[in-house]
Amino acid sequence: MIDRRTLIRGGTATGLALLASPAPAAGPSVVRIWRACVDTPKTRLAMQELRSGLVALGLARDVREAPDGAGAPTFILSIVAGLASETYEIARSGDTVTVRAASEQALLHAVFDLLERQGALFGLDGTMVPPGGVRRWSLPEAGRPWRAEPAFATRGLLPWPDFLNCISVFNQEDFRAYFAAMLRMRLNLFGMHVYTDTLQPTEAYLSVRFAGAGQQAELETTATRGWGYLPQRTSTYGMGSSELFDRETFGSDAARLAADNWEIADRTAAMLRDGLSFAGDLGIRTGIGFEPYKLPAAIGDALPPEARSHPAGFADSVTAKRLLEARLADLLERYPMVDHVWLWEDETSNWDSRAKDVPISTTAFVQAHDFLRRHAPRKRLVVAGWGGFTRHFARLHQNLPGDIIFSALGDTLGWDPVAEAFGGLEGRERWPIPWLEDDPSMWFPQFRASRIEDDMRRARSLGCQGMLGIHWRHRIVDPTATYFAGAGWDRTLSARTHYARYARSQAAPSRAPALAGLMLDCDTGGAIASTYTGATTPDGHAGHVELSADYQEAFKYRENTPDPAMLLRQRRTAARFEALARLADTALERERLGYLAGFVKFLVPYCDAYRNAHALDAVLVRADALRKAGDAQGARRLVGEEGLPLWLELLPQVRAAIVDFQSVIATRHDLGQLASMQNKLVRIAVERLRLSLEEFLGDLPEEALRAQQAALVPASGAPRLFLPTRPSILRPGETLRLFVVAPGVGADARIGLLHRGLGHTDWSRTAARHEGRAVHSVALGPVEPALGVIEYRVEAEGRTGTISDPPAGGAYHAALLA
């Protein structure tokens, strides 16, 4: 082993870029890269990304920085004048491939494009290469270079905060991993909406002081009440889920480690400020904003009644105008690096305006534009809203300055087409926001590439210059998110072609076509549960059903029940996914196919439990009517004969849903979803429905209590080890904490981070620190700049053997930028 100190003392490093790979495969002995451009952090990053990518793909074993070499493939990276912004071309002559780019950013884009054409996949959850590597180059023909320019000048993401499986639970390392992923996906804009409502927790990213009062500052944790969540200790989770959490509260350290409300706000702002600054270093523009016509509860309580009684409305009062300036000034003070300030129409107004067309006030938008002109003229204002906001576009277009950008979420959770109103904004920049996933199906896998394909084609036809994708989760959204990123450059990319490409990154060549077909069936064939029903409502919107709406209680069995025909298709689809996963012949392929199969598999018992809970609720409604009519005995008999058997049937279904999902989770977002499912599915189905039964039956029979206990018993399974977050860029001299989740490995297991320079033989090992239950942590960095590229993995050595992440001798490649 090499002493770990040989990997530290790296104070001059400016970045570390991550690439996951299987065990090394054979390739050419030497490949050369030469930078025919100015030596900068970004051009060095481009070279190291190309170096690590080619090795990870199995196309090279040794990549050297040299201008040429007889018989060795050579890549020349250059920046040239005369190309439009972000454009590049890749040409080949003999053994030499020349990359010519318009800028440093375009050079990075070109390298990522080149690697993707070889088989790499850049997604929200990081980078994947085909399980067995690749054996053939994919290069342009001599004299016929590849040329690329973006289909949209603005290509971004809008990660939505508010749940346990999203940006709300981020720590520093999560923001680092996220922005590095955006860079590799060739995206260039990050947007963020902040709820400042009285009905839900007021998010801590913004925290204004006004009229002598401050505001509540929260990030969603398992100790939070709101969005259908109730406070719950993670130690109370059944089925063994508690072992996957290090302490009683799961969430961002900014919230769970803070002493009080003010420290939550300060920690949150510091964390996001660090993340946004880092995004800027990578060339990603950023923006954040709020709903000007919605006030935090405490701020609203502090306002004078005379402001609310203003004849023209509160927005035109002196108090409202001073408050808006205070909110804008607070935003700019907290995040001076942002490029855009967003003002949002609130969600309630959007849905209310469907029934009654109420014009939106322009007062706040005009005032904010003037404020930015005076105090931050380089920052641009974006006005946005939910899908119904486009109903205001024509009037707003006439009344607002032309440099304000218009944006809106797709209507009906993105299942309606991009609004025609975007086409009536001649001369104005506009960005539709398609839904990469929707929250009424928040726990489900969602394959939406075909929907995004339609949205992007229509947005281009309406003259839109940009698009941002709204999402919450990462890895399970990548089948759609990677399409969105790719189609932002390739106008011809179809969902069908994309799924085939995505499948090749997950499965061996013999199984990739079957996987692609399954994903396409889920997308276009109604093969699994979906929010979209395929129907159109009388008012012309897409019909939708909510079976796991995480913005409320999710397990909302009272409102609806799954379609029986869909349940049959879903059962068959889950069996096909599972059968395909069983055919995997390497540990890496088993993990990737098993992840997708597990997500689809848990839908079956979940929907069965949902259906039984719906039937049980109907029994309880009838029993309640009997009780109100004075027939308590009849109510008791009905619940005992019809209700209790349904509960006994759904208990093992709830258990199966949790155990199936729990067995494949691999990311921090998955951990958050597991916490949500414990809080909403398990708590409601196992605890609340039991109390509902006891209202009529009193003490339940022993068999029912035994069934309840059996449903909650910790599940046994094979030992697992995974890194929920894999940050991919380090700043000079810093260290990032990585959590390691290791259920079933045993208390005496030896867990550590292994790391070495790429091409080196010996590994250095850093021991993990136990954080609580089955959760440990390791430190990544600082890294010695002279190594150029390192690779690392986490391992657990126990009585049952050694397991690792990545599995079977694989590694995460990390290219150092010095």
Q: Which residues does each PLM region occupy?
A:
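N-terminal export signals
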Residues: 6-25
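Substrate-binding groove of N-acetylhexosamine-processing glycoside hydrolases
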Residues: 143, 333, 345, 349-708
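Aromatic-lined carbohydrate-binding surfaces of glycoside hydrolases
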Residues: 151-416, 470-480, 486, 492, ...
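Glycan-association/targeting regions that enable binding to alpha-glucans and other polysaccharides
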Residues: 685-818
